[in-house]
UniProtKB/Swiss-Prot annotation:
The lineage of its organism: Eukaryota, Metazoa, Chordata, Craniata, Vertebrata. GO terms for biological process: generation of catalytic spliceosome for second transesterification step. It comes from the Eukaryota. The gene is PRPF18. This is Pre-mRNA-splicing factor 18. Pfam families: Prp18, PRP4. It is found in: Nucleus speckle. The modification N-acetylmethionine is found at residue 1. Heterodimer with PPIH. Interacts with PRPF4 and with the spliceosome. Part of a complex containing U4/U6 snRNPs.
Length: 342
């Protein structure tokens, strides 16, 4: 009994020493006792407890909206109104809200750029990019000036000099599709670059005022775009890793183009781009024998234009070069295709 009384007295004395009970209060929280014991332990060990600063700045929020709202200082308007309008239109945002000033629109653009970065940059119109490059070349020419008597070739398109003629290429075309894949790829590369050079020379021969017109810039941009579309194809031809089905179709197209059989070349192009093999419905393999519809599903008969974006682009570039070839090397009307694309 004495032990129990002594323990009660000890705990009561501990509560009084810790100052846990205030006036008119008969209870305390266990967390307060634990906090007092922790402070006493730190004092015995010699640690100094730093008081918490109530006016301490809040931690940086992970939410960009809160960060922008906390930073209310007036930032200078670093963009012109025209640039703000252009960036807002690129993102599909209104250029001005009701009652909004130019500075408010700039602040709204700043918030949009922080919250929603450009995720569709790769899906922009590459023809527009080519046109912008042409315009920038003309601006550089105006800023840099031109010496009197100097020939204006600064903004001419790049010409692929293959040091060959159409007659030599037609002679090489006789050996296309004879089983030598490496030779076929070399002939395809040489002929396509030859057509790109012919197209570039035609555009470079225009008058200066024609080059600077809207249609002239569009034609130059189309040539640049086609050249960029065909780069992956040239890379595959150079590395000898062009898929066999596409290589076979392109070989037929080039062979017919060199023979000036443009209708047949167009048919081969459609065969490669669209295909004519309907996919069979239902079970195609039962047991060890294939059903009738299965026999028609070969890679040669299946469309390639929708396989991926890279294939679609160089197939489209090939179609443009077919138009250029027919334009510069005509034949009988019965063997020509009516093109209105270029």
């Amino acid at each position: 009994m004495d032990v129990l009384k002594s323990e009660i007295l000890r705990k009561r004395q501990l509560v009084e020493d810790r100052n846990l009970l205030v006036e008119n209060k008969k209870y305390f929280k266990r967390s307060e006792l634990a906090k007092k014991e922790e402070e006493a332990y730190f004092e015995r060990c010699g640690y100094k407890i730093q008081p918490k600063d109530e006016d301490q700045k809040p931690l940086t929020s992970s939410n960009p909206v809160l960060e922008l709202e906390l930073a209310e200082e007036k930032l200078p308007m670093t963009l012109s109104r025209q640039e703000v309008i252009r960036r807002l239109r690129e993102r599909g945002e209104p250029i001005r809200l009701f009652g909004e000033t130019d500075y408010d629109a700039f602040q709204r653009l700043r918030k949009i750029e922080i919250l929603t970065p450009e995720v569709n940059k790769g899906l922009r119109n590459d023809l527009k990019a080519a046109l912008d490059k042409i315009d920038q070349q003309y601006l550089n020419e105006l800023v840099g000036g031109q010496e009197p008597g100097e020939e204006d070739t600064q903004n001419d398109l790049k010409v692929h000099e293959e040091n060959t003629t159409i007659e030599e290429l037609e002679a090489l075309g006789e050996s296309l599709g004879k089983g030598d894949d490496h030779k076929d790829m070399d002939i395809i590369t040489k002929f396509l670059k030859f057509l790109l050079g012919v197209w570039a020379k035609e555009l470079n021969a225009r008058e200066d005022y024609v080059k600077r017109s809207v249609q002239g810039k569009l034609n130059s941009a189309t040539q640049k775009q086609t050249e960029s579309y065909l780069r992956p194809l040239f890379r595959k031809l150079r590395k000898r890793n062009l898929p066999a089905d596409i290589k076979e179709s392109i070989t037929d197209i080039i062979k017919f183009m060199l023979q000036r059989e443009y209708v047949k070349a167009n048919d081969a192009y459609l065969q490669m781009a669209i295909g004519n093999a309907p996919w069979p419905i239902g079970v195609t393999m039962v047991g060890i024998h294939a059903r009738t519809g299965r026999e028609k599903i070969f890679s040669k008969h299946v469309a390639h234009v929708l396989n991926d974006e890279t294939q679609r682009k160089y197939i489209q570039g090939l179609k443009r070069l077919m138009t250029i070839c027919q334009k510069h090397f005509p034949t009988d009307p019965s063997k020509c295709v009516e093109y209105n694309a270029l």
